[in-house]
Amino acid sequence: MDVRVGGKYRLGRKIGSGSFGDIYLGTNISTGDEVAIKLESVRSRHPQLIYESKLYKILTGGIGIPTLYWYGIEGDYNVMIIELLGPSLEDLFSICNRKLSLKTVLMLADQMLNRIEFVHSRHFIHRDIKPDNFLIGRGKKMSIVFAIDFGLAKKYRDPRTQSHIPYREGKNLTGTARYASVNTHLGIEQSRRDDLEALGYVLMYFNRGSLPWQGLKATTKKDKYDKIMEKKMSTPIEVLCKQFPFEFITYLNYCRSLRFEDRPDYSYLRRLFKDLFFREGYQYDFIFDWTFLHAERERERQRRSMVNQGAESGNQWRRDASGRDPLGRLPQLEP
């Protein structure tokens, strides 16, 4: 069945799902370019897609921000059509056997700090910094890290008056507990400092392979959040970053020292990691741990795609009712 959305996009197979809807591969009928199509039921209890689309519009033009092509309502669905990207940092972390080299972690830190600073410069905080929400580009953009998923983002200051949102307590945890800042666990309203602290935990997750508060047994969500908070607060930063360069300790201590309304010194944090990078003798060549692994998979995917293209066009019956392709191909690396 030929399903079209946004006037000129053909809906393809499902390539992923998030907490607020499903993501499909799409094709621009005029150009043949592939896109990502995100769908969310209009009957969703907490619709977020139209809000997220508006965020992408506000962030338009930023390096590492996916291009928004169209958003609106089609039938029973809120629809957002954006640039198709490659795998997430979580996917790539798994491809690399769940451990990244210091060189790769530092190149990621540089780009991720840039993305967070840009979002903050547009008066928003992300509030869900995690490896799943950073994707690499495709083709010529394979060395660019993109920030995605702005459904939980919040305006932290008035663009006109520059007035900061007020300090509040008693807030429920927004985001992902594993990477949430200590203040977020304590129920304090999030601000710029919390995005940066979360990034610190992401970087240590990549360095170590896991975080000390992962895999804790709990009976309820609240119990789990409480146990994560207790473990996070009782693990000294020096212990968390043990056997890794002191810059990671300095980074997290700096983030935790910031006051609610403080503007972080992004340049200082980038310089911290860049100095370490060059002191270690690394070349800023955009060759990550996964570069060759991913390129190899991508070539194999394209080869198989070409082999199967002819067969697919005349053999739609091969797909089962769910839309899955039982031909047993390599797993797709798109989001």
Swiss-Prot record:
Active site positions: 128 (proton acceptor)
- State the family named in the UniProt similarity comment for this chain: Belongs to the protein kinase superfamily. CK1 Ser/Thr protein kinase family. Casein kinase I subfamily.
Task: Give its E.C. classification number.
Answer: 2.7.11.1
Q: What class of enzyme is it?
A: transferase
- A Pfam family cross-referenced in the UniProt record is Pkinase
Task: Tell me where the signal peptide lies.
Answer: none
Q: What are the protein's UniProt keywords?
A: ATP-binding, Kinase, Nucleotide-binding, Serine/threonine-protein kinase, Transferase
Positions of region (Disordered): 304-335
Catalysed conversion reaction: L-seryl-[protein] + ATP = O-phospho-L-seryl-[protein] + ADP + H(+); L-threonyl-[protein] + ATP = O-phospho-L-threonyl-[protein] + ADP + H(+)
Gene3D superfamilies registered for this protein in UniProt: Transferase(Phosphotransferase) domain 1
Boundaries of every Protein kinase domain copy? 9-278
GO MF, one term, reads: ATP binding
Organism for this UniProt entry: Eimeria tenella (Coccidian parasite)
Task: Provide the organism lineage as a comma list.
Answer: Eukaryota, Sar, Alveolata, Apicomplexa, Conoidasida
Q: Bias regions of kind Polar residues — which residues?
A: 305-316
| Positions with biased composition (Basic and acidic residues) | 317-327
Is the keyword Oxidoreductase in the record? no
- Which residues make up the binding site for ATP? 15-23, 38
Tell me the protein's name.
Casein kinase I
Instruction: Tell me the PROSITE patterns matching this sequence.
Output: PROTEIN_KINASE_ATP, PROTEIN_KINASE_DOM, PROTEIN_KINASE_ST
